[in-house]
Amino acid sequence: MTAQKGELRQGYTTGSCATAAARAALHLLLDGQMPERVSITLPDGGSAEFSPEAGRRDAAGASCCVRKDAGDDPDVTNGLLVCCRVALLDDEPEGHIEFCRGEGVGMVTLPGLGIDVGGPAINPVPRSMIREALGGLLDRYGLRCGVQVTVSVPGGEEVARKTLNARVGVKGGISIIGTSGRVIPYSEEAYLESIARTIRVARHSGSTHLVACAGARSEKLLRRMYPDLPETAFIHYGNRVGSTLDMIQHDGGFRNLTVGVMLAKATKLAQGELDLSSRTVGLNPQFIEHLVRKTGYAEDVALEAKALELVRSLVDIVPFSSSEPLYRALAESCRRVCRNRFPSGGLEFVLMTMQDGCILCDEHGCRDV
């Protein structure tokens, strides 16, 4: 997909690639030749063209591949071949599509994804796209039968280890995904949908207690506190803690919530900032100085805190402990902000540093853990 100068180039989802590969494979099966270009209709009504490759045809079916182009998005699936093998099912009715899992495509092992457990991780929108693309071609040839579609992605199992698939119960490969058919570089919508997906899987898996944290590093600390919780109960918000809390509250299926935040990001959250990205809000020395003064520390401590260039160095001035009024006040402020987004249910806030442990605050107060 081309872009104007200075714009980020869009790409296409694995769902679009699978649709194009399936259409090219069916064309090869019915016509005997692989098309040089294949056009598909996207969910928004637009169209996209692809160049299929690696076409093969035998007595039982045909296969083609389309190489994934994610545009300027840092997508781990970029460059992978998305392949489809199609075979006619003469005993099945018109419109019947049997989706099968090939190499590198994951298997769904948990509920909550809108796909039957045990089935291939081909999401509902790509399934609909493939069904439409093949139906039109069958009509053109006057065929009234079903089609078996086997989707494979060579190298997909290895790439899947770099994704959150295992966390949402997709094992053994990547998912064939996409709601618009397009990859928008650094898409906020796609990022938030990935968080929503982990929340849905947690609920469908029976979790009533969620632990929300920025990522793997903070999760490692929190797992020590909750060793009996399943992996699906740990939700990564990245920097979007506000949106994540909103989704958890809207879901309504959770009785207890623990929110863990590292010290530097906690100074942002305590000010009411709900997007903790450094691009959105930076270090505020005045806020830290104000909090130090408010909690009764000496003038020299306040001035040292104001001069900080890195928040994590605050522990060199005030030892990290729940006995210190500074950290209790910071954690309690963060908990109040979170409570505004999660008004019902039990709520814990955990203030963390990598070196000095954790401070947990709930309705009973704060303590070291």
Swiss-Prot record:
It comes from the Bacteria. Gene3D superfamilies: CbiD-like. Its EC number is 2.1.1.195. The keyword S-adenosyl-L-methionine applies. Keywords: Cobalamin biosynthesis, Methyltransferase, S-adenosyl-L-methionine, Transferase. It is an enzyme of class 2 (transferase). Pathway: Cofactor biosynthesis; adenosylcobalamin biosynthesis; cob(II)yrinate a,c-diamide from sirohydrochlorin (anaerobic route): step 6/10. One of its GO terms (molecular function) is cobalt-precorrin-5B C1-methyltransferase activity. It holds the Pfam family CbiD. One of its GO terms (biological process) is anaerobic cobalamin biosynthetic process. It catalyses: Co-precorrin-5B + S-adenosyl-L-methionine = Co-precorrin-6A + S-adenosyl-L-homocysteine. SUPFAM superfamilies: CbiD-like. InterPro entries: CbiD, CbiD_sf. The keyword DNA damage does not apply. NCBIfam families: cbiD, PRK00075.1-1. Belongs to the CbiD family. This is Cobalt-precorrin-5B C(1)-methyltransferase. The gene is cbiD.
